[in-house]
């Protein structure tokens, strides 16, 4: 039994993004897009303090007021859920992830989820859009699997965001 219930209407919530180096360093997507250069400059400054011998260049990912990511990951017990992957497929429907500049990896949260996504055609839609479907396993959230390239900007729908969580070589530009 519970003492009380807190009900939140998620349709009134804005999607958010957490920047390095802590989950609390979060902004609404709208806020991030509007102020990307300034926010990424702040990440670069903090990176210089944490890793003084390294040179990070995230601001180059902002061109003409738009943010260009090198990699996308949908994974883990939060991101790899059926609804998240189904929604990603709906967003990408009849579109492409591009010609090789951007890579998108999708890790369903479990084999039953993966099977259902395949049965209803979601996996096919994602593959046609250019995504790579990976095996279900607990790992992408802590850096096992797709590690970002040096000075690459990786957008991840996962549960973790700590220093060196996704990139293990800060000396080579991985955060």
What are these regions (language model features)?
Residues 1-175:
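Fe-S-dependent hydro-lyases/dehydratases of central metabolism
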